[in-house]
């Protein structure tokens, strides 16, 4: 019974970032994305939910790997801060349409992600490396966000 509870907890840990991302996306209207001017090399709208789903799952897996033996409070706090910043970006960009503020928010997310990766690396190198696609995607998002600022 104890192992069953642990397995359920581990599954929740892995999928929690994905669920959070889905819930935060329900708060906004993505139709705005279709009407704003976007920079060159902007991915098609359909790419975003696919990419974010993969990245959120990798985030959950990293968190699980780093905490599977014991909970590391630094990793936990870094993860929570990062996800709060991440989820709030969606609201700031799409709902509030505050593109400059959302770009600043992205810089904070990138810095938070670097801190998260450093904390993960101390505990589990694989967990840290799983976050590099997330970091790269955040840099792409910053490029897109700045492009939206310039073009709109």
Q: Where on the chain are the PLM-derived regions?
A:
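Membrane-interface helix-boundary motifs at transmembrane edges
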Residues: 2-6, 65-75, 120-129
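Alpha-helical transmembrane segments
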Residues: 9-21, 81-84
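Alpha-helical transmembrane segments of multi-pass membrane proteins
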Residues: 17-32
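Terminal transmembrane helical module of multi-pass membrane proteins
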Residues: 126-152
